[in-house]
A protein has these predicted regions:
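N-terminal catalytic or cofactor-binding beta/alpha core of small enzyme domains
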Residues: 1-66, 71-150
């Protein structure tokens, strides 16, 4: 079965750049014919273009297991943790931008506190330490490479 890694986020906002940074770390380091990486610092995948990206993927790659990577907001005590769930991910939920869910495995790096308010969450994502993003992206990238033996 093909494994499709979708790294969600935008390089325009530090707190939302975790996915693209992981994609950047993985993109040229995966040398297996059945593993595909989508989303990096140059080609962002967000709630705005996810439908088009999925349509393209589904036309090109059959029988896929989807692994999604994104930054997330949560309780203050979870900041810096990586949450792995064998379930779908909802894209753009911190900013109430989407209720579209998909995927088989979700990897979320907790980058800030969920304030339960769209404007406060937007500000939270824009005030994340780049060091936290770098550390989480390194941790996630290394684990993926180890698990997939690439």
């Amino acid at each position: 079965m093909n494994k499709v890694i979708i790294c969600i986020g935008t390089s325009k906002c530090i707190g939302d750049s975790l996915g693209p940074l992981v994609g950047e770390n993985l993109y040229n380091r995966i040398n297996k014919s059945n593993i595909y990486v989508f989303g990096n610092l140059k080609n962002n995948i967000t709630y705005q273009n996810i439908d088009a990206v999925l349509s393209k993927i589904n036309k090109q790659i059959k029988e896929s297991y989807f692994i999604l990577i994104d930054s997330a907001l949560s309780k203050k005590e979870n900041i810096g943790k990586v949450i792995l769930t064998k379930d779908k991910m909802t894209i753009g939920s911190a900013l109430n931008k989407s209720n579209f869910s998909f995927g088989d495995l979700s990897i979320k790096g907790i980058v800030g506190e969920n304030k339960d308010n769209e404007i406060k969450n937007f500000n939270e994502l824009n005030n994340v330490s780049i060091n936290l993003i770098k550390e989480l992206s390194k941790q996630i990238s290394n684990k993926i490479k180890k698990v997939l033996s690439v």
